[in-house]
């Protein structure tokens, strides 16, 4: 299982490796071992789910995967790997990967139905189905959007998107500075140092509303920023 899921070695190649060493192990046998191993690990997975939901902050995202020969789906169709991680200051750190055949919001809603903390995500509306969580926008996604909107070779003096990008960089730099401090100290530092940067950022975002020169990417990012505020 480590070779398959950590090292990326598929079972047919593992079969060949064992065969070179004079050991006959069919892919069917290896697959059955993986299935049985997954059953043994289920209690641990349930405990990870409980620890994840007990926290105060969860970051979530989903990405496209393709599964060959999946029942009821064409090989070229898209499935999803949903990824959930504890906030960086949680006592128990959990990294939870959940495969699902689609991007429906019912999947995070089911896993996080008892979660009452802050859920940090991109702007995908499917996360709105998580019933008790407080949605929070992800600054890493926002930063990437500003970066993608920057013309090649742009600087903060020539591109509106670059200005947004630099605001995000300032916020990330401040967060790195606060790392290791007591939660109360971090709160005070954020109020003293981060809040003025955020106020300036939101004022700048509002100014884009009145700027007809902004390109479509910049306008799109402005709307995303305002909706995630």
Regions found by a protein language model. Give the residues of each.
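Catalytic center-proximal scaffold of phosphoryl-transfer enzymes
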Residues: 1-229
